[in-house]
Each structure stands twice: as C-alpha cells, then as structure tokens.
Amino acid sequence: MRISIIFHSVCANNYLVAKTFYESFKKRGQSVSLFRVADPDWIEQKDVPLAAKENLKNMMGLPMATPEVMLESDLIIMGSPTYFGNVSAEMKAYMDLSAKYWVKAQLAGKKIAAFTSAGNPQGGGDLCLQEIHTFGMYMGMLCMPVPTTLIPGENIHPFGIIYYSYSKYGEKLDPKTQTAIEKFSEHLIR
C-alpha cells in the first residue's frame, strides 16, 4: 500500500500530527511519504518557542504536494488547520488543483482519512474534517472514519483526528492525540 500524507501547517501543529502519522506507518513497514501544500504567504514566525522553530524549519524542508501525488497513492491522509470551521485557503487551493481528475473519476476508490488542528473544541475542527471528507466523496474516494472503539472510553470524532492546540505553537503533541494517531494508523492498514 502506498500512503501519502498531505498537509498544510502554519504553526507546526499539523506538521507534528503528520509526522506522527508518518512515523507510525513507517514502524509498521508501510511505504509512506510526507508532503506539504504550497503556502506562498507563509512567513517565519519570530516569537515562537525554540522547539516550534525547529519543527517549522524541518517542515519547510519537505517536498511540496502536487495533485499527481494522489494519483500515485492508495491511501491519502489529508490534514489542514481549521479556519472558521473550514480548511485553510492553501489546502482548498490544493484540492481545487485536483479538479482535473474529477471528470474521469481518477481518484475513485482511493482511501482518504483526515486530521486537523484547532484552537479549542469549539473551534470548528469537526467541520474542517467534514470538508476533507466532502472533497473525498466528490472525487469518489472511500472516506475512512475513526471507529468508535478506537480508544475505549475516549470520544474521538468519527471524521478524523483533531489536535487541540489551545493557541500553542507546534512544540509537541499531547499523549491522547499521539495514542489516537497510533491506533488510527494501525486501523487504516488492516
């Protein structure tokens, strides 16, 4: 199975989620690649913690995603920051670039899963995940929900993984999010 993780990140929060997915698939012996979407307006943040600066630097060294990446993938993990209950403009632009594949349903049958970061539980992260799944459905892709049994006793949104940053820059993920990513990765390759 060829897995591509395609994400947009400004503060390195989504980069951390994407990287954790990447590492989880790698340790399970999967063929996985990590891509960031183009962000021509991105500027280096000055007043951020040192760990976040290092993560942002590493993120900027990743290859850019092209729509062709999706054609070459069996499973696509797509992630975007949540902006007003939606994906970022940069992720939407990336999605729109793939419109050429819609006419002939060239992405039909491929699996898609979603993740996002949001400032807090009221930040609209669920709506952002829904937008990624809506994109997948229009492209004929198979949307992969999070099973209710992923982590017994925990409430994980069925549309994907949400990392709540509480306005922090991408320094490290909380243990609950890390566990959810590990378990969801394992579920996706069954």
Question: Which positions does each model-derived feature cover?
Answer:
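Short, glycine-/small-residue-rich phosphate/pyrophosphate-handling segment
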Residues: 108-154
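N-terminal beta1-alpha1-beta2 submodule of the flavodoxin-like/Rossmannoid cofactor-binding fold
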Residues: 1-104, 151-190
